[in-house]
Amino acid sequence: MKRLHTLLAALAVTAAANAQIGAPYIHDPSTLAECDGKYYTFGTGGGGLISDDGWSWHSGADRPGGGAAPDVLKIGDRYLCIYGATGGGLGGGHAGRILTMWNKTLDPKSPDFKWSEAVEVCASDGMEDQDAIDPGLLLDPTTGRLWVSYGTYFGTIRLIELDPKTGFRKKGNKEKDIAIDCEASDLMYRDGWYYLLGTHGTCCDGVNSTYNIVVGRSRSVEGPYLDNVGRDMYHGGGKMVIAAEDRACGAGHFGRYIIDEGVEVMSFHWEADFELSGRSVLAVRPIVWKNGWPIAGDNFKGGNFWIESERRGYALELTVDFVRMQQERQGWFNRNQMEQPVKPIANQTLAEVIDTWPKGDIPARISDYMNRPHQRWTITPVNEAGGYLSNPYFKITIQGTDRALAATGNKEVTTVAAYTGADEQLWRIEQLTDGTYRIMPKAIPGMEGVNKEYCLYSAGDSTPTLAKYDFNTDNCKWNFKKR
């Protein structure tokens, strides 16, 4: 019975793959924020979620004021929170107020935790075609100016400017309409382009919500924001970023979080996760940039693969002798073979070669992919080992065996005869912004704490090692080819 319960629990975690684990229940999540090693997000109604590792989430974040759809941004050594007090039909109409407040920390247990008095920065009267709700923040990295986009389907998406030192409305600033037919907007900047993200479709209808996230871009923060075919978002344009998936629907309230150069994630909610009673949950997915446009990447889920280096296209493998497969010699000159019926040749099996392998640790290397047992890897999530933003850690073993890839104390990679669950045998796998992946050991023997610097690295065409991550070299990048 105990084994059955364990199996069912594992299946439940696997089935809820669209959501983070723990209690990730939230609606209208703010952009993720990091404070003293923990991650925070705030939602409609006050409060929010906290995570120690970015994978398992629980309630406990504290935000006064109630209201809806907050956003949060670290500016200097303080955190600015912005939220809608009413509007969006919450009070029976569309008269709304957007307010800002500051805190030195997001940790409600800290002695420094205290929100400043909330200050109104804009409002809607319920009569005009505008709704002061759903604010999103952007601190322009090129100018230092602080912008807010806000609004709903009730009217336009508007842009205003705040003073980044006070969080107050910039004196003399006049609002500008920049989009329609969306809500829960957000702004981001990349490579000379400003991007306006908007949530399109129907909200708050559970498994029937059609929410999806669209985007346009502009060379100016004030627009116009055009999509991939030139449609202005002020006239209903928008390129799809993420929509419903097989077991979840209602993607809304985009937020961008940069982990490292070339490592970005988007936070949002699913209006309904079908595996979690159709509840609204936090989701975190990689951002992949394709031809200058953001799209939702895929959280790695494990399976059977060969692991290919981006540097050369060679495969990661065990350093063992190559065992030849038996086949009658071919050629135009072998008339006897040419007259035989055609039949398939079976792949080489593990049983045919495993006894030729050493019994202890076997170093890893990189070589031509030949679909041989020493090149076939099984990658399995280890949910009980914790995780990082978007995923749990994984173990990487030779398919059909317990032989596991591991980091060594001298920053090399080897395989140990049997997986033990040690931190150096756990791997962080993240999709990069170009669609490739980085692979990082959770820990390196002899180094303190969780490893956040060193990744699997092609030191040469045939030599894997561990080296500091650098997005600007293909030596750090890998691809997983499904078997």
Roles of regions detected by a PLM:
Residues K2-A9:
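Sec-dependent signal peptide recognition
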Residues A9-N18:
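Hydrophobic h-region of N-terminal signal peptides that target proteins for export
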Residues Q20-I133, L139-C182, Y189-I242, E261-N304, ...:
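Beta-rich carbohydrate-recognition and catalytic domains
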Residues A244-I258:
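Signature of short aromatic-glycine-proline-rich micro-motifs recurring in repeat-based ectodomains
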Residues G250-G252, S280-V281, V450-E453:
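Short, surface-exposed coil-to-beta transition loops
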Residues G302-R483:
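Lectin-like carbohydrate-binding module/patch detector with strong preference for beta-trefoil
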